[in-house]
Amino acid sequence: MREVNFSIPNVNKASVNITTTLYDRRALDCTSTLPLINSLNHLAYLTTSSARIRDILTVDGGIERLVCILKEGRSRDLMEMWKWSLAFQCVVNIGVRGSESVRTRVVEADMVPVIATILDNYIKVVEKARARADSESQRHSSRHHSKAAPISSDAPSRPVYVDQSTNTEQRPSRRQAPPPHIEIPPFYQDSHASDSNAMDITSSPRVPVTSPPERSTFGQDAHNLRSNDTRYAHAAHRYRVMQPLATALPPMDAADGFGLRPVRDTERLPSMLPGFQNGLASQPDSPTTPSGPAQLRSNTQVAPARPRPTLRQQQSASGESDDGNGEGSTLGDDPGSGETAEPIVGIQNRMEIDDDGDRQTVLEGVSNTHDLTVNDTSESQEAETFNITHRSTVDGSMINNDATRTNGALGLSPTQAPNTANSPAVVPSPYSLYVRDRSTTAVQGVLTTMPKDEDVLMSLQLLAYVSKYCNLRSYFQHSHLVPKLKVDRELQMLEDGVSPIEPAEEEDEYLLPDDVNIFPLVEKFTVRHHSKDMQYWACVVMRNLCRKDESRGGIRQCAYYKCGKWEEFQRQFAKCRRCRRTKYCSKDCQKAAWVYHRHWCHTTP
């Protein structure tokens, strides 16, 4: 469709647009979404590379137009969401890369309420997720205690050793008395054993710890039993959680696929036959992709037993599927491994008033329910440089906080820790995991209306650059929230799963009082359960609050946000003894502010 007011027929343009070489202010007033997205995409490049374009936008009303686009709110339509994100990127580029006068114009264009609303929405969703995670953890802990009570009461009356024909009741006795060393027979005569025997067959390759293992040897009939007996699917999962694989896997010293040699086609194992390779991608032999000993291939009936290959003829086939991590993640969800998989998750119950200064993250692993999903990948990867690019692709590198303990709980060898040195920074969105279990029709589009991690990070970065000017501090301490950007109704839809019938009451933004102080919102992002990038920029903003106002004689303001007193003369207030940055008018203000100040109070040399 052609826009009547902005069409240029002589150059065959349906509307005026901005290109990488031409800036036209009229393009920002376009009413069609598609050409406006095209113009904003090019404007994002221009605001990054051209200082002149940034200066022009401050005098021709371009910044005000971009802020108006942001205040229209987020829509569930993908194109509208794209338009909002591009406009937000343009404003951030102008404020971060612009001069002092340009940054002042960004604040005067009423950008602070937009940032305050984004931060407030993010905090609300995080608190929702934390409350739900706490309730889930309490429910799981109470269920585990109720299961553990009868076991502990019956334990004294039980014999230490029980008959081999019993099922899983023999597990406590096996933990107390390890089985004796057993020899590996060349053949297994009984191919149809009971469930407990299936577990014994899988344990037969275990060699004594005193003699170092040299290879993974698995019998032909043991593999037949796995493929034919459907009960193995349950027995293997229960057993692999308890089995220390340091005695079942070969050493990783050899770099040529365990140092095993190729075999002839006539002497291949059944797992290496062509029938087992259908649909499996070929993978190179490497120490990080071994053929797992307990991988389930398929339920296909195998050929009769053949003579087992000699020790020199066994090899880790390149066509075997490397699904060790997938099996390990399944073990974490297995109900039978309740107390074994429990230490994987460490959820912090309180957010701000714990005095544990050495705590790394709120989540030390990955929870099964993914309720509290504010994951700090910077903690696990020990990031040395700041990278604002946040990708939402989830891979296995996000669970490398404690490789030895986590891999041991998942049934993986410690030598198989994923190599994340060259892996990209992975920051999963807290909203995608929070909404994942609420995928009803009424809430499918709710995710697009909420701020993402990169939106919060760019908001904090923009605030860090514009909040260092003391003459603009009143804009930050007396602001408001944008009604069309709030997510209160969307959060209610996530909890209820249905869309509310009554329409939303439209609030006039100009009638709202300026009673929102943005600094307390920013201070909440200094808590350690946020990512390190968020913590860094939030700390920069809070340190800007402690700057002295040179225009007023170099006096400072009390750092407690509920106080806000200014010094009457220089050095009237006392500084914090630890960081030597913040100043407080009294001990009461310092005690009240310490709840959050301790997160960004860093010792100065």
Swiss-Prot record:
Entry's localization field: Cytoplasm
Domain of life where this protein originates: Eukaryota
MYND-type ZnF: 560-601
Keywords per UniProt: Cytoplasm, Metal-binding, Sporulation, Zinc, Zinc-finger
GO biological process: establishment or maintenance of cell polarity; positive regulation of flocculation; sporulation resulting in formation of a cellular spore; ubiquitin-dependent protein catabolic process
PROSITE patterns membership: ZF_MYND_1 (PS01360), ZF_MYND_2 (PS50865)
Compositionally biased residues, Polar residues: 279-302
Compositional bias per record (Low complexity), positions renumbered to this chain: 202-216
Location (main, coarse): cytoplasm
GO terms for MF: zinc ion binding
Binding site for Zn(2+): C576, C579, H597, C601
UniProt region (Disordered), positions on chain: 133-227, 268-342
InterPro entries xref list: ARM-type_fold (IPR016024), MYND-type_zinc_finger (IPR051664), Znf_MYND (IPR002893)
Gene Ontology cellular component annotations, sorted alphabetically: cytoplasm; MUB1-RAD6-UBR2 ubiquitin ligase complex
Membership in a protein family: Belongs to the MUB1/samB family.
PANTHER family referenced in this protein's UniProt entry, alphabetically: MYND-TYPE ZINC FINGER PROTEIN MUB1
Record's function text: Involved in determination of the onset of polarized growth and morphogenesis. Plays a role in the regulation of branching in hyphae and spore formation.
Record-given protein name: MYND-type zinc finger protein samB
Gene field: samB
